[in-house]
Design a protein with these regions (language model features):
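Active-site mouth loops of central-metabolism enzymes
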Residues: 3-22, 68-77, 102-110, 137-144
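Conserved N-terminal beta1-alpha1 strand-loop-helix module at the mouth
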Residues: 1-43, 51-57, 61-67
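Non-cysteine beta-strand/loop elements that form the S-adenosyl-L-methionine
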Residues: 3-5, 89-97, 132-136
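Conserved, mostly hydrophobic/aromatic
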Residues: 10, 30, 83, 91, ...
Length: 144
């Protein structure tokens, strides 16, 4: 299934932080447009990714339509907990093939990330959440 990642990947590096209501409107319009999978945001450190600091509240306010999968990226156990508490039912773990990119995003090597993801995946599964994974920089990296 193709997942629309604009609300997360498209907004996370913007200098201007969109309001919660604008993010909710964007996601609701994507739902109305017929997308079956939408990446709402991420549960990363709010200091590191301030554009995603309000993902918890966005999840609570979007109009979730049956048959549409709403998910988010997590990086650690705190992210799993935040996702669970706001009703997120699908989390994604992401690792980069680029050591420099992975260090910049997660402050860990790809190998360290994969190891730490094991407990995240187990915890999410025990909470009844769906889990997926993704690989960044699979076809090359401008970081190296």
């Amino acid at each position: 299934m193709i997942c629309e990642v604009g609300p997360r990947d498209g907004l996370q590096n913007e200098k201007r932080i969109l309001s919660i209501s604008h993010k909710v409107e964007l996601i609701d319009r994507l739902t109305e447009a017929g997308f079956k999978a939408i990446e709402v945001g991420s549960f990363m450190n709010p200091i590191a990714v301030p554009q995603m600091a309000d993902t918890d509240e966005v999840f609570k306010r979007i109009n979730q339509k049956p048959g549409v999968e709403y998910g988010a990226i997590i990086a650690n156990l705190k992210g799993v907990e935040r996702a669970f508490l706001c009703g997120c039912k699908k989390v994604k773990l992401n690792v980069s093939t680029s050591i420099q990119h992975n260090l910049a995003n997660l402050n860990k090597t790809p190998e360290e990330s994969i190891e730490s993801f094991k407990i995240c995946a187990e915890t999410a599964r025990n909470k009844g959440m769906d889990i997926s994974g993704s690989i960044s920089m699979a076809f090359g990296s401008p970081w190296e």
